[in-house]
Amino acid sequence: MKLIAFIAFLLILITIINAQGSIGSSSQSLSSEVDSSDISSSGSNSTASSEGSVSSSSNSGSQSTSNSGSEASGSSNSGSQSTSNSGSEASGSSNSGSQSSTDSSNSGSQGSTGSSNSGSQSSTDSSNSGSQSSTDSSNSGSQGSTGSSNSGSESSGSSNSGSEGSTGSSNSGSESSSGSSNSGSESSSGSSNSGSESSSGSSNSGSESSSGSSNSGSESSSGSSNSGSESSSGSSNSGSESSSGSSNSGSESSGSSNSGSESSSDSGSSSDGKTTCISFHDTLSINTVDDDEIECTGKGETRCISDNNYKCATKQRHGSIECSVNGYIRCTGSNIKCKIGNTECSIRNSRLDITEKPIFTRGPRHH
């Protein structure tokens, strides 16, 4: 009997213990439900201090106030570094891998200030496509310290397409220190285009220019220089060298010079009866000796062309004309018109007019 009572007591204890275990497990499940409802990690919509962002709002794993993997302090899109877009490094806004410290930088450009686009490097203003520029806009891989630089150009002004320049605009590989430089040109000031080098003014396509505009490989210190010309002032075109004025196509000139010519001065007339003109090749001098006389001298072959070679014609019957083949022509009269090479000389009331310039000469003749 005692054994039966003891077994019954054990069964009651086991029942009580089982009942307490079920109550504890139910309470634990309730507490776990409460804990899981409290924690709730959503992993979406996080502004500031989110993963991959330095400060401000960041989208898609970017670092900085930037978008898509960019590192920057301003706003940045698509993997850019800086206040930049698409992989660019900048403090302003930079697009597509550009590096820029201020303003906007696009597409891989590197720049400290301004906008930089597509891999350009720029310190100020805008830099586009891989250009390097310190100020202004730089486009497409240009390197520049100031101004705008495009496509790999270096420029301090504006530089386009691989140009190098410190100021102004530089395009396509040009180098420019000031002004604009285009396409590989080097320019210190002004504009430089396409590989030109220019210190001031504009330089285009590989030209070198210190001032003014220089185009296509020209070198110019001032004025405009085009296509490989060298010019210190004025405009120089196509491989010309010029110290002042305009120079075209390989010419050296202090005034204006065209097509490979060398000239210190062009034509000039005065009312006092003394006028001197120096041509491009044969250094032709045309002087008004007195009120009714013209004297033409040249170091090369000088021709007076009308109906026949070595012949001059007067509009009136009076007056005397001398023509020789050794480079000396003398015309006297009040109304005389003669051609020397492609130069037409006329004297009317002691005034000399030059309408055309000689193109070439065959050299001096000896007798």
Swiss-Prot record:
Knocked-out gene: effects: Aberrant ratio of prespore to prestalk cells. Cells stall and only 10% of the aggregates form fruiting bodies. The fruiting bodies that do form have abnormal shapes, with enlarged stalks and aberrantly small mass of spores. Cells also show a decreased exocytosis rate, decreased pH of endocytic vesicles, lack of morphologically distinguishable post-lysosomal compartments as well as perturbation of the cell cycle-regulated cytosolic pH. Cells infected with Legionella pneumophilia are defective for maturation of the L.pneumophilia replication vacuole.
Signals that turn on the gene: Rapidly up-regulated by hyperosmotic stress, which is dependent on dstC. Strongly inducible by 8-bromo-cGMP and to a lesser extent by 8-bromo-cAMP. Not induced by DIF (differentiation-inducing factor, a chlorinated hexaphenone). Up-regulated following Legionella pneumophilia infection.
GO BP terms: culmination involved in sorocarp development; endosomal lumen acidification; exocytosis; hyperosmotic response; intracellular calcium ion homeostasis; membrane fusion; regulation of cell differentiation; regulation of cellular pH
Keyword flag Signal: yes
Record field: compositional bias (Low complexity): 24-273
Cysteines paired by S-S bonds: none
GO function terms (MF aspect): phosphatidylcholine binding
Ranges: Sequence repeats: 147-156, 157-167, 168-178, 179-189, 190-200, 201-211, 212-222, 223-233, 234-244, 245-254, 255-265
Compartments where found: Cytoplasm
Biological function: May have dual functions, one in vegetative cells at starvation involving cell-type choice and a later function involving progression to the tipped mound stage. Involved in vesicle fusion in endo- and exocytosis. Involved in L.pneumophila intracellular growth.
Name of protein: Protein rtoA
Organism: Dictyostelium discoideum
Originating gene: rtoA
